A protein has these predicted regions:
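Cytosolic-side transmembrane-helix boundaries in multi-pass membrane proteins
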Residues: 1-31, 181, 201-215, 286-329
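Single transmembrane alpha-helix segments in multi-pass membrane proteins
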Residues: 27-34, 44-94, 120-124, 258-270, ...
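Inter-helical junctions in multi-pass inner-membrane proteins, predominant
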Residues: 38-49, 187, 227-258, 270
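Hydrophobic alpha-helical segments embedded in the membrane of multi-pass proteins
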Residues: 53-63, 79-83, 110-114, 181, ...
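Alpha-helical transmembrane segments within multi-pass membrane transporters and channels
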Residues: 95-136, 178, 278-279
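Helix-loop-helix "hairpin" substructures at the membrane interface of multi-pass membrane proteins
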Residues: 97, 101-102, 112, 116, ...
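Transmembrane helix-bundle core of multi-pass membrane transporters
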Residues: 123, 127-189, 218, 239-244, ...
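Transmembrane alpha-helical segments in multi-pass inner-membrane proteins
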Residues: 242-305
């Protein structure tokens, strides 16, 4: 086979892999609609659930793309979301100030991400160790605050009337769209995104060209922190209360969602900012479909198994694009 034929085959495979996440999203949406209607449930109710869960996951995952592009990961983002929301609620209950609550949420979210980046980048502690430690510490502190102030079951809350004007599709779409467009611009049209892709693809070569690894790692974690802050605020808008289990699964769901969106698990030049958006809603759709199809008594375990199978299949398919003798184009 000549070089031109190899190149054509490579490009066809690349195009197919790029469009697969969108096809999967449309297919999952159709399956959800058919399943809900066949069981006689209200479609508008399920679509609202999918939308509210998907927006939070997509927002946090969009910020996390910057970390995953470096070939790194952060499984403490769910705990950071819980911790930020907890301190935000405590701030409002102490001051009755919505503006101060929002400020605290974002300050805590970015601060937690900065702490993770400093431990990983400056002190050279492995990212896995850092994020696991942060996840455990933040979850424990948040749980202690919630238990002390509101009880283990009841949790802590803010008045629902405070955020009810914001609990609508238009506001949430606007938040997601603005944040995604900002991240899209930074990721695809500035040197920050280009250099982070370079670092994820070949860190040794990137360092030899003079790119500062620590600088761009810190920027990545800051962007993830902003996403966590938005996710915590949107969570409080949808459910104006916080319990010890709030946002508990977001950390791992982000990893699955980004891969579902077609982004390689190793990051690098094939990273795409739309992966968080497409993958986030795809994962939520799949999760709700499985809840509808599987008996509730065993649903959670089976759902996790099916999600894991989907995850491995997507990783395998996206990995096909890199098993060639050609450099990424």
């Amino acid at each position: 086979m000549d070089n031109e034929a190899i190149l054509r085959k490579y490009k066809r495979r690349q195009i197919l892999i790029d469009v697969l996440p969108f096809i999967a999203l449309a297919a999952l949406f159709a399956v959800l609609c058919i399943t809900v209607q066949s069981k006689g449930y209200r479609l508008d109710m399920y679509l609202k659930i999918v939308f509210n869960e998907g927006v939070v996951l997509a927002v946090v995952a969009t910020g996390a793309v910057f970390i995953y592009t470096l070939g790194s990961f952060d499984i403490s983002l769910g705990a950071s979301t819980l911790f930020s929301a907890t301190l935000g609620v405590m701030t409002y209950n102490a001051t009755n100030s919505l503006a101060l609550m929002i400020l605290v949420i974002f300050a805590v979210a970015v601060g937690c991400s900065l702490l993770s980046s400093v431990l990983a980048s400056v002190f050279h502690i492995p990212v896995f160790v850092t994020t696991v430690a942060m996840m455990s510490v933040l979850s424990a502190i948040a749980a202690q605050i919630i238990t002390t102030n509101g009880g283990a079951l009841g949790g802590i809350s803010i008045p629902s009337a405070l955020v009810k004007p914001l609990d609508n599709m238009g506001f949430k779409i606007a938040v997601l769209a603005v944040f995604w467009l900002i991240c899209f611009f930074i990721f695809d049209f500035t040197k920050i995104g280009r250099r982070q892709k370079f670092l994820g693809g070949n860190p040794v070569c990137a360092q030899l060209t003079g790119i500062q690894v620590n600088k761009y790692a810190i920027i990545a974690f800051v962007m993830a922190g902003v996403g966590v802050g938005l996710g915590a605020f949107l969570t409080l808008i949808y459910t104006p209360s916080v319990t010890a289990t709030t946002a508990g699964s977001i950390g791992m769901n982000i990893l699955v969602a980004i891969v579902f969106g077609g982004m390689p698990i190793s990051g690098g030049p094939r990273s795409r900012i739309y992966s968080a958006l497409v993958g986030g809603f795809s994962y939520i759709l799949l999760n709700n479909i499985l809840k509808l199809l599987i008996d509730s008594n065993v649903g959670y375990g089976v759902s996790q198994i099916v999600s894991a199978i989907f995850f491995l299949a997507v990783v395998y398919v996206t990995g096909l694009n890199y098993r060639s003798q050609m450099l990424p184009r």
